[in-house]
């Protein structure tokens, strides 16, 4: 499926990407000499290899327009959207980074991404309970406030970030280190379907490309590139999340970290290093929202609970004053909730009774097939929970709000780690 441009233009970008390779920075050295992707095809096909490096000769000679057109047909038949560098819906922030993808493949849509508050969030695959709890709360609050959460699809903090945002009915983006139709491992197919319905799954690699060690680091530059900032929740010295932070710093993006609760634990050494280098410590979602509210107030939700915490300066009051000075129309004030009585806990979805369901097994898990009708019910061989995917997004979200984290927890935890590649 083509998005925003004709096949006559897209086919030249497809050929160009095939000729030089998806994440190859050398193609951007060659393109200015040739002009456009179309002109590059015409000149190179005519024998002008003067700006093709020796490393790229084999790929350039192997690429043909026939192969490019067949790849476009394949993507159209598999409902894969394609966005070339010249596409009006191509993420503008990606255009500004070093070595942007010449072509993006997507399940889902990228429309509206250019003026959205996108935060790349993630961390270690083996987080502490403290980090999981804090990450869940912050990502949920960010999503409720209108922030788009972008991450990988690995088990651990990547899945925690995505799951928490989806529970808050927020938009999410997952960037893969392989092709969209490469299910590595195979269980991730279901997780990708859910994420695509709640936002988009992206890759710069051709649909059936398998992951390699080089693809993971290249993926992280795209992850940080589509975002305004990187939120690293927990990382040791060798954590792959640090490469996302490194790319974010090189791209001029903000870096945020959760303060560790064990200063001398090596599992937090990477985050401590980022904080020492000037990363912003995040105590709640407002530490991230404060950074962007002045410019992106129109994209945020004024009724989000995070803006109503008693005793703190209200973001909307501050912005109303700023807007009056600049002549801008102020955002509407948030609706206030009645404060909880002393010693009384505020009522939340989490504190509501969820144990009365008769659709649970002995361990308390919900058999979603008993609650949601669907033609796409999967039973993982090593994970006994029955879960369902539904085309009715509202039905899924309403079920989650009533039953907690069951649906996406089980889908993501049933999947092995896509980033675990030897």
Model-derived regions, located:
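Short, small/acidic-rich helices and loops at N termini and domain boundaries
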Residues: 1-88
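Glycine-biased, small-residue-rich flexible motifs in mid-sequence functional cores and linkers
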Residues: 2-7, 84-422
